Amino acid sequence: MKEKRRDSKGRILHTGESQRTDGKYLYKYVDAFGNTKYVYAWRLTPTDPTPKGKREKPSLRELEQQIRRDIEDGIDSTGKKMTLCQLYAKQNAQRANVKKSTQKQREQLMRLLKEDKLGARSIDTIKPSDAKEWALRMKDKGFSYNTINNHKRSLKASFYIAIQDDCVRKNPFNFKLSEIIENDTKEKVALTEEQEQALLSFIKTDNVYHKYYDDVLILLKTGLRISELCGLTVADIDFKNEVVVIDHQLLKSKEQGYYIETPKTKSGIRQVPLSRETIQAFQRVMKKRPKAEPFVIDGRGNFLFVNHKGKPKVAIDYNMLFVRMVKKYNKHHKDNPLPHITPHTLRHTFCTRLASKNMNPKDLQYIMGHSNISITMNWYAHASIDTAKSEVQRLIA
């Protein structure tokens, strides 16, 4: 009968186990893919003391138990050792055809992962507590709740790929961020009808800002995203059918300059109905466009909203415009100031106004270009005391 192998303490070693001359234990095995692998440990069992000067790590028998479980579950022993950065890069490579804005967000997250200790960790060692600590570090660095939540969503998607590929069993990013970090995102508030009229009246009569009256009116009466408004050309206004055709947006970056992009989602491609007031505003815009050299971007020209040099305006131009405009208004109306207003505030106001008038949700979803009806339905939940009063009066009259 063949004598069983023993370690330096006289203990019988199991199949695949051995002990080197320096005292370190070794386990040889074949993984789920037929590859020969080795693991090492200074301790044979969990109760063995760690040799002096050596790091505290799992014993060989603990490693064997994990290996057997991985083999039984078909876990990829190589794949689980990839770092979080490598996993995120793998996910991005599988979905390479994305918008430039999405690509910039990806680059930001990859840069953050490389700067953070979590990025170099192998994915099989990342626990929910590690993911939560990462979120807290992002908060300490000054990132907003929404930014952290978006990055968390991306990493959660990455781990689902790892689960599907049998690299890990669980998703450490499958938790609610609001349980870790307070959601301090300010609720977007629509302008009241009085504020809307006050803004329009001020712009119309102001000697500086009157030239932007039509821009603001069109935003208020169409609910367009600011990048969609900036991208409008003469050909996009269909006066015969009284609609504006939305099939692109105009953006600008430091790296690339001006560029044309498709709408935010497929639902963003739409035709927005125009009121008589809005049609007249578009006609005035066309009439007062400065005569300048043709400016063509990605094959599109004759942009409607341009500066004095004939170059198209972009979102940042309007953002700064609204800051200055509201500041001047509030300087002369200290008793009844306007809130902080952005171009998106006007889109929010347009949607809220139609929702409060009980427009068919599916029709409003189409006009707004929302990809999901749940986004549209949120606006119907934004009741105010004024709309509540009118509804009560209507129902009990």
Name these PLM-found stretches.
Residues 255-260, 357, 378, 382-397:
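DNA/chromatin major-groove-contacting recognition/catalytic segments
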Residues 1-44, 248:
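Short, Arg/Lys-rich segments that mark the N-terminal edge of DNA/RNA- and chromatin-recognition modules
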Residues 232-290:
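Conserved tyrosine-mediated DNA breakage-rejoining catalytic core shared by Y-recombinases
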Residues 69-75, 86-142, 158-161:
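Basic/aromatic-enriched alpha-helical hairpins
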Residues 149, 164, 168-232, 240, ...:
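Basic, Lys/Arg- and aromatic-enriched nucleic-acid-binding interface segment
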Residues 145, 201-212, 272, 288-303, ...:
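Short, basic (Lys/Arg/His-rich) helix/loop patches that form interaction surfaces
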Residues 236-243, 359-378:
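Short, polar N-cap/turn motifs at the start of nucleic acid-interacting alpha helices
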Residues 12, 35-39, 46-52, 83-111, ...:
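Short, aromatic/basic-rich helix-turn unit that serves as a nucleic-acid recognition element
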